[in-house]
Amino acid sequence: GTPINQPSAGDTPFGFEFDKRGHLIVSDAYGGGELLGAMSSYNVSPGGISLISGPVVNTQTAPCWVVITKNGKFTYTSNTGTGNISGYWIKHDGTLELFNDDGNTGSTGEGSKPIDMAINNSSQYLYCLNGGNQTISVFRIDNRHGGLKPIQTVSGLPVGSVGLAAN
């Protein structure tokens, strides 16, 4: 098909993922500007791309990777600059709503610099690769409300580790 050029609602679109209804969810990094992070959602159709919601500000820094639970109810972005993860509800129409007013749904620790994330097939666990301290933070996902409960941190990864997959 013909490529479509669509300006982003937020500045510096970085991570992206499609939910089960075909909505495009995008992290807006704002050039890594302090406490400017956000996410936006878009409707994608043969006629083009249109904004559903956003930018929905999370007051965190440098949102990076985006993951969505299998049921399509929750989405998360890793905030590299502030060492945490922000969670959002995805409403049926694709509208995003931030879980926590402060945007901190799960902390990966000071200096952790979370980058890549993955959710296992049952959407029970979220794994976050932390580039600042070469660890993986593991969280249990609350399947009713989307909250994140820290389970463990795995250390000893090689410096420069990138990419993450979960089953």
Residue ranges, per PLM feature:
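Short loop/turn segments immediately following the C-termini of beta-strands
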Residues: 29-31, 44, 80, 90, ...
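Blade-level signature of beta-propeller repeat domains, shared across WD40, Kelch, NHL, RCC1
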Residues: 131-167
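Residue position within the beta-strands of beta-propeller blades
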Residues: 25-27, 77, 128
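Short loop/turn segments immediately following beta-strands, especially the blade-tip
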Residues: 41-49, 87-97, 139-147
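A short beta-strand motif characteristic of beta-propeller blades
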Residues: 1-7, 51-57, 97-108, 149-155
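C-terminal hydrophobic structural anchor segments
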Residues: 86, 94-133, 138
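Beta-rich, blade/repeat-based domains predominating
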Residues: 8-24, 36, 57-73, 105-125, ...
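Structural motif
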Residues: 34-40, 84-87, 135-138
